[in-house]
Amino acid sequence: MARVKRGVIARARHKKVLKQAKGYYGARSRVYRVAFQAVIKAGQYAYRDRRQRKRQFRQLWIARINAAARQNGISYSRFINGLKKASVEIDRKILADIAVFDKVAFTALVEKAKVALA
């Protein structure tokens, strides 16, 4: 059986990892062994945070809607319940946008929710 030397493949793999680690601090961008661990960990963080981003944005939207709803004299949960009863199907992302940029329209939605709750 012939001896297999893996110089080309190993170099290619090392180059690939070091390219991914470009911009990392110190040995993390220069030493393959350290860079490999850093790249693996970065991938784990990226995977986790792609899921967390969705949660965090929803939390932000809810906080903004709650603040705007309370300025109009209604709590977030009662406001959402009122919108459901009034069969207004606007998602939280759009509601938060309306709350920040169009106060008049948001006030109209609050009034609609209050009427549906009464």
Swiss-Prot record:
InterPro entries of this UniProt entry?
Ribosomal_bL20, RIBOSOMAL_L20_CS, Ribosomal_protein_bL20_C
Report the record's Gene Ontology biological process terms: ribosomal large subunit assembly; translation
Q: Write out the GO cellular component annotations.
A: ribonucleoprotein complex; ribosome
Task: List, in alphabetical order, the Gene Ontology terms for molecular function in this entry.
Answer: rRNA binding; structural constituent of ribosome
Keywords of this entry: Ribonucleoprotein, Ribosomal protein, RNA-binding, rRNA-binding
- PROSITE patterns, A to Z: RIBOSOMAL_L20
Kindly give the HAMAP family that the UniProt entry links to this protein: Ribosomal_bL20 (MF_00382)
- What role does this protein play? Binds directly to 23S ribosomal RNA and is necessary for the in vitro assembly process of the 50S ribosomal subunit. It is not involved in the protein synthesizing functions of that subunit.
Known NCBIfam families for this protein?
rplT_bact
Q: Which family does it belong to?
A: Belongs to the bacterial ribosomal protein bL20 family.
Q: What is this protein called?
A: Large ribosomal subunit protein bL20
Q: Which organism is it from?
A: Edwardsiella ictaluri (strain 93-146)
* Gene symbol of the encoding locus: rplT
